Amino acid sequence: MALALTEMGSRLEQRSRMALEEDTREQISFCSAHTDNYEDPMLVISESRLRDNARRFKAAMPRVRPHFAVKANPHGDVLRIFKEEGLCFEVASIAEIDAMIKLDVNIETVFYSNPIKSPASVRRATEAGI
């Protein structure tokens, strides 16, 4: 039975990798067709990939409440998508605290875990209810 489950898991992982590779190829093709006038580097973010990754993470660990580190990508749309997918957030600066307020997240679920906190940032976090 264990071997059958391992083989099934391997096939699912292989299909998942193939779908991911196809999605990546489509994104590269799309970007290539739309970036002829750009010379500077750019970051392209897939909303569907963000949503899928958030859902997969939550499904894999249903008892865990994931907290996205805002410093990893503070773009408002990324934060909005993760909020809509039910993720919580971890902040490390006044700007990130303010982003949470602007996004109207449940402040009680926000972690403020910067190991080096200025008095001003501690005051701001306290004022925000973190």
Task: List each model region and its residues.
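A charged N-terminal "starter" segment
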Residues: 1-130
